[in-house]
Amino acid sequence: QYMLDTTLNDLNKYPLKLSDLCVMTCNLNDAPEKVVWASSPELRHDDLPNVGLQGDSYYRPMQIQGEWLPYISKVMAIDPSGKGSNETSYVVTGLLNGNIYVLDAGGFSAGYTEHVLNKLTQIAKKHKVNKILIEDNFGQGMFEVLLKPYLIKDYKCTTELIRQTTNKHRRILDTLEPLISQHRIIVDAEVIKRDYDLTN
């Protein structure tokens, strides 16, 4: 009788898998022309904290090919905290050759305070983002109005309000699943380490 790996059955139930991400050390300003994904055992990131399903893991690229080129675009997305206890969260991404590089991500529990607004501005400045996308939860653009004076003072940058009407989990699946399953999302290893340290 064959011994079945029951963890594979669990993994097949869920469309988002850590193993479909590429995890490497990303640069602030440039990225390789091509990143080749694979999930061979020798490429597994055993040094990274893993809170995914049993049997799921992070993997290094199999190959990095071509020259390192500047990102064609860098975007920061902000999801302001709502009325409950959730955080103001952000992510910074770079785009090159159809790949999205996750360069930074985090959150602040202090809501819309001066500290949070200043920190977000400094993060945008550090990464030299071209645009800041702000999810307009229900504040009629309030967060954008609060953030703009900090941007005018320290880092002039375009902002854009994004209004969402669909369920957040559905949006995550519809948007991320095609990109992740095609191994188009490449995450900086430090982002994973820091996220784990801050939430555990």
Regions found by a protein language model. Give the residues of each.
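RNase H-like, metal-dependent nuclease domains and their acidic two-metal-ion catalytic environment used
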Residues: 1-162, 188-200
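Conserved beta-strand -> loop -> alpha-helix junction used to position metal-binding or nucleic-acid-contacting
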Residues: 153-182
